[in-house]
Amino acid sequence: MGSRHFEGIYDHVGHFGRFQRVLYFICAFQNISCGIHYLASVFMGVTPHHVCRPPGNVSQVVFHNHSNWSLEDTGALLSSGQKDYVTVQLQNGEIWELSRCSRNKRENTSSLGYEYTGSKKEFPCVDGYIYDQNTWKSTAVTQWNLVCDRKWLAMLIQPLFMFGVLLGSVTFGYFSDRLGRRVVLWATSSSMFLFGIAAAFAVDYYTFMAARFFLAMVASGYLVVGFVYVMEFIGMKSRTWASVHLHSFFAVGTLLVALTGYLVRTWWLYQMILSTVTVPFILCCWVLPETPFWLLSEGRYEEAQKIVDIMAKWNRASSCKLSELLSLDLQGPVSNSPTEVQKHNLSYLFYNWSITKRTLTVWLIWFTGSLGFYSFSLNSVNLGGNEYLNLFLLGVVEIPAYTFVCIAMDKVGRRTVLAYSLFCSALACGVVMVIPQKHYILGVVTAMVGKFAIGAAFGLIYLYTAELYPTIVRSLAVGSGSMVCRLASILAPFSVDLSSIWIFIPQLFVGTMALLSGVLTLKLPETLGKRLATTWEEAAKLESENESKSSKLLLTTNNSGLEKTEAITPRDSGLGE
């Protein structure tokens, strides 16, 4: 049974009626929780200013010859370099110089001045650290002293999470095809709550990382399966808008991270509160039906018919008999077309030199989109000003970006919108690098422009990739692009960590990649107004048609766009934030 025949059901019961809208917003609400967990480490993994803890009780503190400080307050005064230190006198008369990762004991106990040229002996920070608590009372870093020689453990918090995202998207996508969408939705959402709470109550670093890893797997699994679930209930006339705007709910999660981080400054309480966002979905997800698409593929025709009847009743429409509409063979499960069951490996994406260039360009765009998306978000704490407001604003601009994509891609074309979005992102990165840090407001505004542009590109690449390849490898093309995207999301935190070497390294990486991707995008064929390719010959013809640039205006743009969305079956689609 082809997707075109299945669309006949929606012609009877409605493409996006009341039934589909209720399901859509229930499932989209859980995307908010996924967005929360993807970016929770922006604040949970913050490394506050700190100094080594002295080996005894302090009687006096000196910093740059000013002595009216408490030791807890001086941490915020240290520069990012290692040369600054705090001089303290202990109650036993010893004088120590405390820096970020070491401490020195002065041999001459009569000199408490900041400048000291006498002999001193260096000791490691075996007594722990004193952290600045003006911004955060505690973070995962302060909980387990992930600084200095243990700093690399803190750097793994977000990359390991993204590695879990990579595995989860593959694992749960497989399970949903075997066990059904409904079961996996319930299992992943329940597990998100359990692993989220487990991370908050972790007794050590390794338990915390394990809980976060499994949290990432189930969150990613939900995003993939939830996307397929809602797309299998929505008809072709609404599928493009509905699929793109699922990203908007993910962006709302970013807003909640910023708001919760501002209100709650203790990491485990922050994590617990964020984890409760998934509770409303857990309470109602058990009433969600299985999709008729999956039921039919399993030969469960009576159950599929019941769901279609319920859809028609909710939508106040007339139902239809699946056996007549789809000409079902009631003796066995619905079979796919030969091209759908035919297996293809990655080498098919390098069918010839033309397709090879197309594949490498598409992969680069996926990589750039993900790298830019997470670099802008994770780097919000380095923009200056209020870091919570920065992240909030960077999340807000995503929502109009997806609306812009939905409108612009059918007006001026996929390739044009994608290329100029990448160029705009590259330009924003370049402008941020030349803005003096004292003008941080201008820097934040420019970063918002960059996030808007990269969000638009990121939202468009899913559909554009599917339109560039023939049916026999379409799912493989989107899936491989999604995998490249997730590899970039693993590397993005390391790029942000390099800002300690030079604060603009993330912008340099993203800007360079976006500029290169934009140039190469202009070499791709335009797919607006063209039917989806079903063979390699038709896919290659896209390129020749692009070069010829026929002057004939395509009057059926909107209809053909709908046909493309129809032909991209939910099984071909994937969601990889």
Curated annotation (Swiss-Prot):
InterPro entries with a match to the protein in the record: MFS_dom (IPR020846), MFS_sugar_transport-like (IPR005828), MFS_trans_sf (IPR036259)
Coiled-coil parts of chain: none
Membrane topology term: Multi-pass membrane protein
Keywords: Cell membrane, Developmental protein, Differentiation, Glycoprotein, Ion transport, Membrane, Spermatogenesis, Transmembrane, Transmembrane helix, Transport
Similarity field: Belongs to the major facilitator (TC 2.A.1) superfamily. Organic cation transporter (TC 2.A.1.19) family.
Function: Facilitative organic cation transporter that mediates the transport of carnitine as well as the polyamine spermidine. Mediates the partially Na(+)-dependent bidirectional transport of carnitine. May mediate L-carnitine secretion from testis epididymal epithelium into the lumen which is involved in the maturation of spermatozoa.
Note, other: Involved in the uptake of clinically used drugs such as anticancer agents doxorubicin and bleomycin.
Full protein name: Solute carrier family 22 member 16
Source species of the chain: Homo sapiens (Human)
Gene giving rise to this polypeptide: SLC22A16
